[in-house]
A protein has these predicted regions:
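Extracellular loop and loop/strand-boundary signature of outer-membrane beta-barrel proteins
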Residues: 42-46, 81-86, 129-135, 171-176
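Short sequence motifs at beta-strands and strand-loop junctions characteristic
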Residues: 26, 50-53, 88-92, 135-142, ...
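Short glycine/proline- and aromatic-enriched beta-strand/turn motifs that initiate or cap beta-hairpins
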Residues: 22-62, 70, 166, 183-195
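Cleavable N-terminal export/targeting peptides
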Residues: 1-27, 193-195
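Predominantly the C-terminal beta-signal and adjacent terminal strand-loop region
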Residues: 151-195
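Gram-negative (and chloroplast) outer-membrane scaffold detector with strong preference
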Residues: 23, 59-130, 140, 160, ...
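Membrane-spanning beta-strand positions in outer-membrane beta-barrel proteins
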Residues: 31, 69, 107-109, 148, ...
């Protein structure tokens, strides 16, 4: 996805969220969640060698219209050893986007979300274009598309039983500078007032 298209998509999402806020009082609630997550990342050249990174995410969502919320997420993941590469990798990302919840009128509430933002990789090896030196860090565009299932324990405390996302980023690597990753996790969710 080129830069102009990314900017267009982000501006479009922000515009739609602003219009939605002005039209109707939301029926969903504020919430904050903390999850433990594992990120399945693709490895350097030389076979799949895919690897898992341990970490976590923190999210805050604010209702904007009916079952839609604006979401902000901060995530961090780390591995001390990339297979066949003799280096570790740490990732920190910050993203924002839109979440939709399906009202089920039961203790179980599924959701889907789309997030856009950036990721910073460090404590690793990032190759450089010809004529430049490689670095131990890089920053790029990031995107996450996924969903999950929340289960009510009480009115304000929920268990995030499952959260699964496809993550895309374009940190420099030896495979065309694209990362296609799977992130799965579970955690706890605190919800505000409301219905």
């Amino acid at each position: 996805m080129n830069r102009r298209m990314r900017i267009f998509v982000n501006v479009l999402l922000l515009s739609l969220a602003s219009i939605a806020v002005a039209q109707q009082k939301p029926s969903n609630t504020l919430d904050a969640s903390v999850t433990f997550s594992e990120l399945r990342a693709n490895a350097p050249v030389g076979g799949c060698g895919c690897f898992w990174m341990a970490g976590g995410t923190g999210q805050f969502s604010y209702p904007v219209w009916r079952n839609f919320s604006a979401v902000v997420e901060v995530a961090g993941h780390h591995t001390s050893n990339i297979p066949n590469f003799k280096a570790g990798l740490s990732l920190v990302s910050g993203m924002g986007g839109v979440r939709m919840r399906w009202p089920t009128h039961t203790r179980f509430q599924p959701f889907a979300q789309v997030l856009f933002g950036g990721v910073h990789g460090f404590d690793s090896y990032f190759p450089a274009p010809i004529g430049k030196l490689p670095t131990s860090y890089d920053t790029s565009y990031a995107m996450a598309v996924g969903g999950g299932l929340d289960i009510a324990v009480s009115r304000h405390v929920w268990v995030r039983a499952l959260k699964a996302d496809y993550n895309y980023s374009s940190l420099r690597n030896l495979q065309g500078d694209n990362q296609n990753q799977l992130r799965i996790g579970a955690g706890i969710l605190f919800r505000g007032g409301g219905k």
